[in-house]
Amino acid sequence: LIAAAVAIACLAASGGLSTVYAADTKEKQQQVEQQFRHLYRTIGEKSSTKIKLISGPEAIKMRNGRVPGKRWFATSGQFKFKLTIQDGVDLKVEKLIERLEKLPLPYVRAYEVVSDEKEDGIAVYKSLGGASAHGGKQYINIIPGAGPMVLAHEVGHTLEQKAKESDPEILDKWEAAIEADKVSISNYGDQVRHEDLGEFSKVYAACLDAGEAQLSKLRKLSPARFKLWESILNDGDLSAEDSEVLPRTKN
């Protein structure tokens, strides 16, 4: 009990979730991710995302550790972005593209966000110190074995940080959405609010790929997060009708 209290206190001090779901609650037993996990196995089967290489490979020094690698430029729809693979990694760029194409086209915007002049786009490293991936405004780094659901989670971090440029309160709004929904997404998401957002991004990607029936189910289970994530995903393009359902942040 003491350890649990300390953990909760640490979460609060670090800006973590203000709502902590006890292990024996109904919400915890019916976490949102558990209801859609079966979709992860088939994600991409209905994807219309197509990626085309337009140049490369070019020998470069990658951002993380200045290790040698190869870089390509690619396009998908209206998006243009970079693909970078560390030398010696057992992953062909064609296989990387197959993996990236499994995510719905709106998620490709994150690939472009991390492809500014001094950035590497989607970057594949031999190792990330034990992690499968890292995502932020300037990078999406993955290891060779990271699958599409890992990518979908990291896209959440990238687009959240991009949205924060125009809306510094975006994570406060997300926390308000968590409290309004009163449901846990996953154990990992319960740790801190930005990981909750990453986990929701992952679930939403699977539902978007699966079709309207699954999207509607997700919308009913977590309506506040759903509306806010669609705004983040579509670069703030949210209808007035949808904006009315978003929770207000506390003053």
Predicted regions and their residues:
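Active-site recognition of the HExxH zinc-binding catalytic motif
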Residues: 149-164, 198
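Boundary at the C-terminal end of the N-terminal hydrophobic targeting segment
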Residues: 20-22
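Metalloprotease/metallohydrolase-associated module, dominated by Zn2+-dependent proteases
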Residues: 175-247
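Post-HEXXH active-site segment of zinc metalloproteases
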Residues: 145, 163-186
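Structural recognition of the beta-strand scaffold that forms the well-ordered cores
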Residues: 123, 141, 160, 196-201
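Bacterial N-terminal signal peptides
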Residues: 3-14
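Soluble non-cytosolic domains of exported or imported proteins
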Residues: 90-97, 145-150, 188-192, 219-220
